[in-house]
Amino acid sequence: MALLQIAEPGQSAAPHQQKLAVGIDLGTTNSLVAAVRSGEASTLVDQQGRSILPSVVHYTSVSYTTGDEARANAQTDPKNTIISVKRLIGRSLSDIQQRYPSLPYQFEESDNGLPVIRTEQGNKNPIQVSSDILRALGQRAESTLGGELSGAVITVPAYFDDAQRAGTKDAAQLAGLHVLRLLNEPTAAAIAYGLDSGKEGVIAVYDLGGGTFDISILRLSKGVFEVLATGGDSALGGDDFDHLIAEHFQEQMGLSELTAEQNRILLDAATEAKIGLSEAESVNVEVLGWAGSLTREEFEDIIKPLVKKTLLSCRRALKDAEVDADDVLEVVMVGGSTRTLLVREMVGDFFGRTPLTSINPDEVVAIGASIQADILVGNKPDSEMLLLDVIPLSLGIETMGGLVEKIIPRNTTIPVARAQEFTTFKDGQTAMTVHTVQGEREMVDDCRSLARFALKGIPPMAAGAAHIRVTYQVDADGLLSVTAMEKSTGVQAEIQVKPSYGLSDNEVASMLKDSMTFAKEDMQARALAEQRVEADRVIEGLIAAMQADGDELLDEQEKQHLLQAIEALIEVRNGESADAIELEIKNTDKASQDFASRRMDKSIRAALSGQSVDNI
């Protein structure tokens, strides 16, 4: 693995000239851009002094506007005013229509299958709309910093899938931005607080924005953030606080119905009151001819059910991550709605520690991204040269049948950590060999073997019942650590290896070329191996079942029928046709269906034996 060294060119005419790089928080509701200047990370403002750019684009037949100017058209021209486009990135047209049926836009499906929105300026897909937002942020950055950008780190939600991440990257490239890295939003927030260089352990990132809530549970180990679990509510945010306050005002005013204009005015008043109560104990309200007040206590009573709802998501995320609230070292607050004192108080009580709130919660993600961007372009003193690398060949594990299951794909930026769960193949299996390989081929024999180790002490149980979590972690120096842990007992084993050791660039290129040359043959070999593994599972399972219950549940003719089915499957299994094996597996399953039903009935009778109706 060749390391790419990025540092100030010591022999250059301007040895201390800094490269211009930014961090961009491309948000659902709002977006920001930040940069490190004179060693300090801060957000960049527009000509009106605003750091926040609403994630809105308005199209006319000849031009487009972004931000506040675009949002002003939301009421009068909703079909051409695209809001919250981040929700649409990487989704199919049917998915969008199912998830967001009330959107005012006119959708079509393009030739390449991407959904497009009909506007006065023509059809626009979500990637193009996002690129217009990113272009505005890039132009702001270049104007403020006084030069051309070398690159940008763009943040994405931790739960974004490959299609959504690829769409975000495409949007940035369309906007003329060189993407240094896509960074998970919770990781960016943790970096902003310097947690990446702090003590190792579990970190919670609580992100309550205007329209969405996200909770992420991270583990920091050897400088690598691993996402343990994510959760949240895509339809819960600070906007919901505003709506509840507005409803309270409407009730106080005695109005049963409001016009759209009155509703907007009331919501603006609710937002203003909410912001005021972050500092004051009460605020006076004058709106639509009504004068009243709202105390912090009243406000907190109104929003408490929603805050409790976010804590339910936190509880689920902790359960998914298999950690307790007591295990969390730090809680990072993200999103403007976390300024609300009740939110900070209830989150602090839930996790048993004071949340980190010293950085502006609207800006913390962009600031963390800018710190990462500054590192990635090499803005370090000569004594702190940066090593930037990607994994040149996929890292995987051998599974039954000599197959390769890829854990970390090639071209993944390091440091990185990925985990996957596996199980046992045979009843009573108490050990498992973990064989780590490198390469792009489908079969172990065609890949490079890196290391083997055994995980022992697996409790004997039925095949498929054990849960073994295998974690691959590559640090900034390219050192791979492989850990296997049986989840019920916690027994684990680990090994470290340098995947790049002894591997030249020519060998890497040769391995990549082979993967393309033999792609068709490899997929055929994989399909055959998978069917053979499945056939072995069916054969072993059926033989074991007959040994256990055959004499009791089968007559002699039925036994012979099943034995013939097993023999037929064994014969085909040793052949070279994956389709033939698959067909014979189906025939064997069909032949044994009645036997399986009898075994199930026997198990149920045994389980219910001696039980009273009340107990059941």
From Swiss-Prot:
InterPro entries: ATPase_NBD (IPR043129), Heat_shock_70_CS (IPR018181), HscA_NBD (IPR042039), HSP70_C_sf (IPR029048), HSP70_peptide-bd_sf (IPR029047), Hsp_70_fam (IPR013126), ISC_FeS_clus_asmbl_HscA (IPR010236)
CDD domains recorded: ASKHA_NBD_HSP70_HscA
Transmembrane residue ranges: none
One matching Pfam family: HSP70
GO molecular-function term, one example from the UniProt record: unfolded protein binding
Key word 4Fe-4S present: no
Keyword terms: ATP-binding, Chaperone, Nucleotide-binding
Metal-binding keyword on record: no
A GO BP annotation: iron-sulfur cluster assembly
Function, in words: Chaperone involved in the maturation of iron-sulfur cluster-containing proteins. Has a low intrinsic ATPase activity which is markedly stimulated by HscB.
PANTHER family, alphabetized: HEAT SHOCK PROTEIN 70KDA (PTHR19375)
Family: Belongs to the heat shock protein 70 family.
NCBIfam families named in the record: HscA, PRK05183.1
Record-linked HAMAP family: HscA
Protein name: Chaperone protein HscA homolog
The species this protein was found in: Vibrio atlanticus (strain LGP32)
